[in-house]
Amino acid sequence: MTMFVDSHAHLDGKQYDSDREQVIARAREAGVQTMVAIGNGDGPPTLDAGIQLADKYPFMYATVGIHPHEARLAGEASYQTMEQLARHAKVIAWGEIGLDYHYDHSPRETQKQVFVRQMELAAAAKLPIVIHCRPSDGSHNAWDDCLGLIQNQWARNGLGGIMHCFTGNWAQANRALDMGFMISFAGNVTFPKAQPIRDAALQVPLDRMLIETDCPYLAPVPHRGKRNEPAFVKETARQLGELRSLSMNEIGERTSRNFYDFFKLAEIAESKVPAR
């Protein structure tokens, strides 16, 4: 069976409380070999959310980090907690972190300060970072600030990272690529009005591309409007395949290999990972 990797899933969300086991089983049946449980939780009180899942499932990895929405809640205690959590064997990245000027749930200056502090902590932990970047409607403001901070505070360390759920243009993608980042596409690449994302996806080198669901959000066409889940990552692969004149399975195989190579992980053998 062709393998797929969902490189970004919020499987701790309450949206899955009634059927989390079944959701994960469906993903495995669909060929999703590996999932990354993003460890933002609901902010500082639940920063181990991803680790709890990764501990339970041998085919999951985790991240740790404070999302820009909750930046206003960050403090020394939460930084110390993340430093400890980052040592866990299944934590492979720090994130998602970055800037969100669309919702502005935290003041922008606070977002920047927390972003920079987390880049410092990630560098000390020698972990790549997973970036959330969302500008105000019709603006590039968050992209300008986010890429500038990465250039000044991160790029030189060579650890790189992932531009998660990429929504920018090719110029922004290219700048991120130059700083050692992978570009990850989510279900919104299938949306009718997402032509700028598709234009960027046409130009991102195949060996720098990842796929994700960002579930439970952004369910791809034909599931749009429903709760997203890791099994649906195949629809993102299908759309990218159509753009690049490749099959869904070819995109799945290529992006899976990219994931394992970037994180220096051995491919998880199916025989060692029973479906749950």
Question: What do these predicted ranges mean?
Answer:
Residues 1-276:
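Mid-domain alpha/beta scaffold segments of enzyme catalytic cores
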